[in-house]
Amino acid sequence: MAEIYLAGGCFWGLEEYFSRISGVLETSVGYANGQVETTNYQLLKETDHAETVQVIYDEKEVSLREILLYYFRVIDPLSINQQGNDRGRQYRTGIYYQDEADLPAIYTVVQEQERMLGRKIAVEVEQLRHYILAEDYHQDYLRKNPSGYCHIDVTDADKPLIDAANYEKPSQEVLKASLSEESYRVTQEAATEAPFTNAYDQTFEEGIYVDITTGEPLFFAKDKFASGCGWPSFSRPISKELIHYYKDLSHGMERIEVRSRSGSAHLGHVFTDGPRELGGLRYCINSASLRFVAKDEMEKAGYGYLLPYLNK
């Protein structure tokens, strides 16, 4: 379990937005990074606190990188002291952290936003200080007042970070013609390739692994580890939205099958015997379901947007 504090204009809408994101466990609203230790809603202009949402999330379900990408989806990162119709220092944008270990992920996302926009953004990145929980009537405001004021579209939380429409599944005829016999049997008929002799069991180059049927990105190489099981093993997908999970009772066992989102290709299974320091999961994946894209090939192959996150 981890937490981050995000300022992005009126906190009513921002809290409702984050509460809808899979992997977010709890939200609350408050006032952060003012000049003094106490404040209230009426005193914000005097104390210089920012309206802020506390986001508590399950790192196994959603990463800080994903949380921040959702954040940038609904703010104007170039606007100074204004979001929507709300003006004033209390409506400034900010990312406030408690754990300095979060800084690499924060700076990576911020720098990528600046690269895309071509200029420095107005979002402040600071250690959390002087955080005050807001009054009760502000907590879960839009849940209690569904028609209340909101400056953002909270349904943006339902839109995936990686658009499945960009990775359309080919027809069975095309798949049969384009895939090897083994890749077809594994992805379309849920077969299992032989351990230890497959293509990527011992591959640890920088890059990403994509669905061999659609090209949809699935795993970062940085999340691959040597499990000794004979198949490629990953601690997590690039985003959990890219994977679909199914109960598998075949062969007298109870397992969780994993399939790709867009192609519904059989990938393998996920187990709970992975390294604890990596989150405890082991995605055991058939090489025949994957295509590896090396770091120096990613831009040309259309995956340049993922380059900033390879090592973070």
Swiss-Prot record:
Q: Where mainly located?
A: membrane
Subcellular location, in the record's words?
Answer: Cell membrane
The answer, when asked if Membrane is one of the entry's keywords, is yes
Catalytic site positions: 10, 284 (nucleophile)
- One BP term from GO: response to oxidative stress
Instruction: Look up the EC number in the record and give it.
Output: 1.8.4.11, 1.8.4.12
Family from the record: In the N-terminal section; belongs to the MsrA Met sulfoxide reductase family.
Q: Can you say what this protein is called?
A: Peptide methionine sulfoxide reductase MsrA/MsrB 1
In the UniProt record, the gene name given for this protein reads msrAB1
